[in-house]
Amino acid sequence: MATTHLPPDFKEFLQLLNVHSVRYLLIGGYAVGYHGYPRATVDMDIWVAIHPDNARRVVMALKEFGFDLPEVEETIFLQENKVIRMGVPPMRLEILTSISGVEFADCFHERVVDVIDGIQVNLISLERLKENKKASGRYKDLNDLEQLP
């Protein structure tokens, strides 16, 4: 994935997550591509840890990114099964507080840290990504699972 070029907004958002020390993992299509099956994706999926300090940091990063809406409060990032969407495909950013089949703490401990297009990024590991795809059961996730090494 070393040759992947991230859209400027995605790069900026990842930089802000890093600057604010957010505990996050890149998941979804970008992680699938990183781990060996490059495919089209309509968004960038970011999974964040549910913790008060992390929630505060996520909100700070969002505000600095320009997503400063009254309904985007720390409490959203303290609840499971929440998704915050910004933008429209193919430039949509999605922030998730939980995903199928895996726990954040385990995945963060086993994360892959790499530099993509000049930005240090925390990615879900291949094995945990496969567990997530299998648990999701969606057609596109099962297809990803078949294509991943």
Model-flagged regions — what are they?
Residues 1-149:
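Compositionally biased terminal segments of proteins
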